[in-house]
């Protein structure tokens, strides 16, 4: 658009602009917002208009830089395996074309627990690790069912978080 034309006319290298300005802004973006965006993308990928805890799990893995990701990675949970398990749990749909993507009531509860966890730790924003702790606090969630099928339980995750922190 117009901004691109102005940048081009000023002779500013588009890659340099991205490197110097956009990436640092993205790094300041709270990781949980990135995870939410990735969770929505995962829901769309399998034709769903609902984001549940299982999509949060995929979002954490897809984000790939957080402490929560490191814990899951150390437990040898890969995106490929996690996607396969989640796809088997929820199946494919064609819903997302019709509606805006919404969060399940359990996903909202997990976000609320994550916010309380962050607040109780005197943090100004929710981190992925708060989200992961909130997920494992919901033993009947689809995310925990997926983790169970991947051979990981809440105790291992808590232990992993304590080991990294």
Which sequence ranges carry the predicted segments?
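Histone-fold recognition with a strong bias for associated Lys/Arg-rich disordered tails
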Residues: 1-165
């Amino acid at each position: 658009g117009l901004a691109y034309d102005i940048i081009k006319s000023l002779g500013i290298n588009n890659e340099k602009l991205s490197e110097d300005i956009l990436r640092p802004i993205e790094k300041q973006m709270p990781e949980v917002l990135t995870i939410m965006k990735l969770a929505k993308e995962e829901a769309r990928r399998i034709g769903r208009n609902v984001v549940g805890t299982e999509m949060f799990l995929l979002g954490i893995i897809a984000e790939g830089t957080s402490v929560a990701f490191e814990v899951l990675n150390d437990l040898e949970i890969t995106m490929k395996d996690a996607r396969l398990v989640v796809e088997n749990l929820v199946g494919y749909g064609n819903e997302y074309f019709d509606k805006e993507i919404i969060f399940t009531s359990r996903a909202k509860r997990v976000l609320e627990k994550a916010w309380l966890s962050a607040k109780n730790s005197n943090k100004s924003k929710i981190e992925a690790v708060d989200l992961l702790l909130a997920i494992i606090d919901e033993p009947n969630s689809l995310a925990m069912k997926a983790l169970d099928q991947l051979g990981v339980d809440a105790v291992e995750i808590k232990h992993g978080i304590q080991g990294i922190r």
